[in-house]
Swiss-Prot record:
Listed name of the protein: Tripeptidyl-peptidase 2 homolog
Enzyme Commission code: 3.4.14.10
CDD domains found in the cross-reference section: Peptidases_S8_Tripeptidyl_Aminopeptidase_II
Gene3D superfamilies the UniProt entry points to: 1.25.40.710, 2.20.25.690, 2.60.40.3170, Peptidase S8/S53 domain (3.40.50.200)
Family: Belongs to the peptidase S8 family.
One cellular-component annotation, GO: cytosol
EC category name: hydrolase
Cellular localization per UniProt: Cytoplasm
Key words, A-Z: Aminopeptidase, Cytoplasm, Hydrolase, Phosphoprotein, Protease, Serine protease
């Protein structure tokens, strides 16, 4: 069309926040008063921003939010410290936890006069995208500020060089030049290592006699009297923002009698977008409203900002309790993870039994975004009984409004939408809803709205629609159950010709269904379905060759679900059921009489006559005694009949693809196959590169999807072959699922080849070696002729640690579960020393699953020697880098049963690190070649032929690297060529190290009586220690050991100087110098005099120690004895190694005493760099000195940065809260 044809066209706003597809729009037109009012929706997500557009008030003027809660703990602040306020005329003043002076308003009501203080670094809980934006601005600000300081320092240096163009010869001018150069170098270094810790907020908490009040110094000035004290959000729905730059909204909650304050801010934009789809209310532009603009919201943040908004089991557990406290009617969960075991786990039990079961909370959740292969639904949405799982659908109206396509395609589930069935046979997806929207996001994102798509968007679309139904039912005081709601939306959904008969939510139809229901009838109740064969628990699921080669009988125990207190109803329950099957290959009884305890129902499935591919049917149970004859429950039956591969290649020719078309093939991998090679070539002409989505999926018992499935997005270009390799398991049917990306509009014709490869170790799937065995034979077999160049390389090593301390204790009030049980915490602490900068992975010997887990949560943090938190993680093995230093790993494990935690009191921490130099193990043809050291040489292996070789397992000499310990476990893999797929894991247990201890002469074994007596000092109390020291001084007056011991004990300055002088008087300095000068020229072949070595080493160490004490003392005495200080300083530097940390300490003190602040700062920065993670260094004192030096230099910008950095590196609140 020409431009004039569009002049009168309006934007298709109906597709922006889709509501027609679900009948939500039509329902609101019919019943405008049932717009969600009276319904409270809980949103378990990244948190919802109360300042976002459309989320202020409901259609009736009520606050849109009833509550906002951070369930993760990321925003927790330790406010346990109480301080007294001083009267400063117009204000009250206190010292905040950060060290700032805070001004308080005298008008604040605080009857107890008790002020609790804490502080919080913003970047510990700000969303990741906001942190990045602010860090970019901070870097720009730093560059601007530092350029000015650097320009001033450079100008001053230039003036000096103009005055002294040649290198100055006198000491004073030379020191001035060095000072000016050091200032320039320090500014450059400060800029280079700049890692702004971000804003630091002081937090003040007090009780006004009715409620706790919280004030946050969000502008970091100390003038907190300018801020309004906030109450818990649920008290008055009060919130604020940190500033005009970040625009991040926050509310507060106070716990544990004021000792913990929770700052509630979002951890991402996701949850706000979800809230907009559910219930945004835009009075001036109602077409942008969410599905239920009249509902109220409770934001429950389960996405932990410390983990880039990943949900945690602990947060989920807390959220379930908050759902009960806040009287939530329906919840949306647009979160999920893979689960190896469906419908089982502590979080699942809370959702299924405590919320949906006992309290009729309607649960709506996303199905997952791991399609289009089958059995890709995630937990909790797609795998949990009584949860409404929502798939994502896209319609032509959405395509027009949201995706800017050149033309639309057929309405379709999104390509990436997860599909059922679940591993235990349930259909997985309950209904479909629109899976995309353009709606509200938090102001901090600097956007008013944003396009997002996913089942994360389809779930709130359905949740909002169902909220309309609940609004109508509650307004009419009509009872309902969560089970009845789920059945209504499923059985009235619009037919989409889906593979599992899953339809589109139809709000109006579902409401009519419920309006005509008698909620005392059988269908209002849940029915549990438990099968007795293999994976077929909640339905029949046949997929592997042995399951489909003959008919099978399945017994399902089906029972109505009754809660505690419903014993009477259970005893009187009886229903007459008529059963029907939807496919002729499924058989079930025609009638069943069922009591409250349930009944066994046999189901026979005969897949023998079915063609290869997917087949689906159901056993439907109807209430035969009810006129409506509605379906009471159903047993799904899924058969995926695989095809056998006649050889090692599966080929498809001239396969046509177009948008929305999905092609599936179920294949039985050849025995021995370990990976497939997929080759794709376009045989049709293409205007541009197209996209082919390929999923290679297998269902492996108790295995998460991401460990059994691979998704590939392959670019397809004309006349080019694209190849991908995918690892597989030969024991399970493989689904090869191929789809053109739904929005890739150009059709294409492809040739596809799937080649199976595999060389397997005959006895097992991994190789475990013990180094002390010396050798081990390995037998291999292949499914086809392959290159055979085996190579075993060990690249990593694993060190295991047991806790040094473990405490089990109950948590606080917010960790009481919905059933009244208290959560208990196991806190295990591990000490780890890192010798050099290292990248490592940490994991603990517990299940690494989110939803299918027997614990209510696990979390760990890593702290350095100054109690700075340097890393945190959860159930997933995480990689992190640690600098040289001493660290504590703290591991939190949660359960309602302390006896369960007791079993894990000594849980093992495993740290995996890379070897500096990989170890390649020698291979030999046989044990004779092993003896002759004749290496293995082989080029090929033929199909069906077993090929053997011998591995040499001995590790010694250079291979036994210094970083390895005797209990280290080496890990690596066996490869058979250049291919990275089809490898075999290898582990090797190290032998004891060969002792390199030298023989000692008899004279060296004689005990040093003096040293023994000196050592006794450390075991004596004060008075006895003083008495014993006097005895030693009188008995061994000329003993260096005694004088050194005295130096450790005495504190008074003059006495320390006197002792240092006594030490120096006992040492022949010239003889000491000659000895060490000569030692540098002594060859290794000359025998060593060990006794003399020890004697001279003692003198050298004592000499250095005495000089250190003298220099430390002189540095505190200003300009007193300046020349003596300089002489001792120079002498000490001559004796210290450059790598000795005391060099920078001594330099720092000396330059500081000479008012050479640039040189002092340079030394201090080096000291922090080399020893900042050492527990032996007082980092807090060094940072305090750094701030002092920066003030003296006039570099106030850097002083403010270091002020915050000090709180981060040496937290005043000890270890961070979990």
């Amino acid at each position: 069309m020409i431009p004039s044809d569009y002049s009168n066209k309006f934007y298709p706003v109906d597709g922006v926040v889709p509501k027609h597809e679900t009948q939500a729009y039509e329902f609101l037109k019919k019943f405008p008063e049932y717009d969600g009012r009276g319904v409270t929706v809980g949103i378990l997500d990244t948190g919802v921003d109360p300042g976002a557009p459309g989320l202020s008030v409901t259609t009736t003027g009520l606050p849109k939010f009833k509550n906002i809660v951070d369930c993760t703990g990321a925003g927790d602040v330790d406010t346990s410290v109480e301080v007294a306020a001083a009267d400063s005329n117009d204000y009250l003043t206190i010292t905040g936890r950060s060290g700032r002076t805070l001004k308080l308003s005298k008008e604040w009501k605080n009857p107890s006069k008790k002020w609790k203080v804490g502080c919080k670094l913003a970047y510990e809980f700000f969303p990741k995208d906001l942190r990045k934006r602010l860090q970019k601005l901070e870097t720009e600000d730093m560059n601007k500020s530092n350029r000015k300081l650097l320009q001033d320092a450079t100008d001053e240096y230039a003036k000096f060089k103009d005055k002294f163009p040649e290198a100055p010869l006198d000491k004073d001018n030379l020191q001035t030049q060095k000072e000016l150069e050091a200032r320039i170098e320090c500014l450059k270094q400060l800029a280079e290592k700049f890692d702004n810790p971000g804003p630091l907020y002081d937090v003040v908490v007090f009780h006004d006699g009715e409620h706790w009040r919280v004030v946050i110094d969000s502008d970091q000035t100390g003038d907190i009297y300018l801020h309004k004290p906030l109450a818990d959000f649920n008290v008055a729905q009060e919130w604020s923002t940190f500033g005009s730059l970040d625009l991040l909204s926050y509310g507060v909650h106070v716990y544990d009698n004021g000792n913990i304050t929770s700052i509630v801010a979002v951890s991402g934009t996701h949850g706000t977008h979800v809230a907009g789809i559910i219930g945004a209310n835009h009075p001036e532009t109602p077409e942008l409203n969410g599905a239920a603009p009249g509902c109220q919201l409770v934001s429950l943040m389960i996405g932990d900002g410390r983990l880039d908004s990943l949900e945690t089991s602990h947060a989920f557990s807390r959220a379930c309790s908050e759902i009960i406290k806040n009287e939530v009617d329906i919840i949306n969960i647009s979160f999920g993870e893979d689960a190896g075991i469906p419908n089982k786990g502590r979080v699942i039990e809370l959702l299924r039994d405590e919320l949906a079961g006992k309290r009729n909370v309607v649960i709506v959740s996303s199905a997952g975004n791991n399609g289009p292969a089958y059995t890709t639904v995630g937990a909790p949405g797609g795998t949990t009984f009584d949860v409404i799982s929502v798939g994502a659908y896209v319609t032509s109206g959405m395509m027009q409004a949201q995706y800017n396509l050149l033309s639309t395609v057929h309405d379709t589930p999104y390509t990436w939408c997860s599909r059922g069935p679940t591993l235990d046979g349930d259909t997985g997806v309950s209904i479909y809803a629109p899976g995309g929207a353009i709606t509200s996001v938090p102001p901090y994102s600097l956007q008013n709205s944003q396009l997002m798509n996913g089942t994360s968007m389809s779930s709130p679309s359905a949740c909002g629609g169902i909220s309309l139904i609940l609004s109508a039912l509650k307004a009419q005081k009509k009872p309902y159950t969560a089970a009845a709601i789920k059945k209504a939306v499923m059985y009235t959904s619009k037919d989409l010709r889906d593979d599992f008969n899953t339809g589109m939510l139809q709000v109006d139809n579902a409401y009519e269904y419920l309006a005509q229901s008698d909620f005392q009838y059988t269908g209002a109740r849940s029915f549990t379905i438990n099968g007795n064969i293999g994976n077929s628990k909640r339905g029949v699921y046949l997929r592997n060759p042995t399951e489909v080669c003959s008919p099978s009988r399945h017994m399902f125990n089906v029972a109505p679900k009754f809660e505690d207190g419903e014993e009477y109803e259970k005893s009187h329950f009886e229903v007459q059921l008529s059963l029907a099957t939807t496919q002729p290959w499924i058989q079930a009884p025609e009638y069943v009489m069922m009591a409250g305890t349930g009944r066994g129902i046999p189901v026979r499935v005969d897949p023998t006559a079915l063609a290869p591919g997917h087949h689906f049917g159901k056993v439907l149970a109807y209430d035969a005694s009810n006129e409506s004859r509605r379906c009471v429950f159903e047993i799904p039956v899924t058969v995926m009949k695989p095809s056998s591969i006649s050889n090692t290649c599966f080929s498809l020719r001239d396969v046509s693809f177009e948008p929305t078309l999905i092609k599936r093939h179920f294949l039985v991998p050849p025995k021995g196959a370990t990976y497939v090679e997929i080759r794709v070539k376009a045989t049709s002409e293409l205007e541009s590169t197209n996209m082919l989505w390929i999923s290679v999926n297998q269902t492996i018992p108790q295995t998460k999807l991401n460990e059994a499935s691979t998704e590939l997005i392959m670019p397809v270009t004309q006349n080019e072959v694209t190849t991908k390799l995918v690892s597989i398991d030969d024991s399970y049917t493989l689904e090869l699922c191929m789809a053109q990306w739904w929005s890739s509009l150009e059709p294409m014709v492809l040739d596809i080849d799937v080649n199976f490869h595999g060389i397997k170790v005959v006895n097992g799937k991994e190789i475990n070696l013990i180094s002390s065995q010396g050798l081990k034979r390995v037998d291999c077999a292949s499914i086809r002729r392959e290159n055979f160049k085996p190579d075993i390389t060990l690249k990593d090593y694993v060190d295991s640690f047991k806790p040094t301390n473990t405490v089990i204790k109950p948590l606080g009030d917010r960790d009481i579960m919905p059933d009244g049980q208290q959560l208990f915490e196991l806190m295990a602490t591990y000490s780890v020393e890192i010798s050099e900068k290292t990248e490592l992975k940490a994991d603990f010997a517990v299940p690494h699953n989110m939803y299918d887990n027997g614990f209510n949560g696990l979390f760990f943090m890593v702290f350095d020697s100054q109690k700075q938190r340097v890393h945190y993680g959860d159930m997933y093995t995480s990689s992190h880098t640690l600098e040289k230093g001493e660290y504590l790993y703290k591991f939190q494990l949660l359960s309602v049963d302390p006896s369960t935690l007791e079993r894990f009191r000594n849980v093992t921490l495993r740290l995996t690190k890379k070897l500096k130099k990989p170890i390649t193990l020698p291979l030999y043809a046989d044990h004779i070649d092993f003896c002759d050291n004749k290496t293995y040489e082989r080029e090929n292996i033929d199909a069906g032929v077993v090929e053997s070789f011998v591995v040499g397992t001995n590790i010694e000499g250079e291979q036994y690297a210094s970083e390895l310990k005797e209990n280290s476990l080496l890990t690596g893999e066996l490869k058979f060529g250049d291919c990275e797929k089809g490898t075999v894991p290898v582990t090797l247990v190290l032998p004891p190290k060969i002792s390199t201890k030298e023989d000692t002469k008899l004279g060296e074994k004689c005990a040093n009586i003096v040293q023994l007596q000196v050592d006794l000092l450390s075991k004596l109390a004060d008075q006895e220690k003083e008495k014993h020291l006097k005895y030693l001084q009188s008995s061994y007056k000329n003993s260096l050991e005694v004088q050194l011991a005295k130096l450790d004990i005495v504190k008074e300055t003059n006495e320390r100087l006197s002792t240092a002088d006594s030490i120096l008087s006992l040492i022949d300095t010239e003889a000491l110098s000659r000895y060490y000068s000569c030692q540098q020229k002594v060859e290794d072949t000359i025998p060593r005099d060990v006794v003399l070595e020890k004697k001279m080493a003692l003198q050298r160490d004592a000499f250095i120690r005495a000089l250190v004490v003298k220099c430390e003392t002189f540095s505190t005495q200003g300009h007193k004895d300046k020349d003596n200080y300089f002489q001792n300083y120079q002498l000490l530097l001559n004796w210290l190694e450059n790598s000795d940390p005391r060099v920078w300490q001594i330099k720092k003190d000396y330059y500081k005493s000479q008012n050479q602040y640039g040189l002092a700062l340079k030394a201090l920065l080096e000291l922090l760099k080399e020893n900042g993670n050492s527990g032996k260094m007082d980092v807090a004192k060094l940072l305090s000195e750094e701030k002092e030096l920066l003030v003296n230099l006039g570099w106030n910008y850097w002083h403010d940065i270091v002020f915050v950095e000090t709180v981060k590196r040496v937290p005043p609140y000890s270890y961070a809260l979990f």
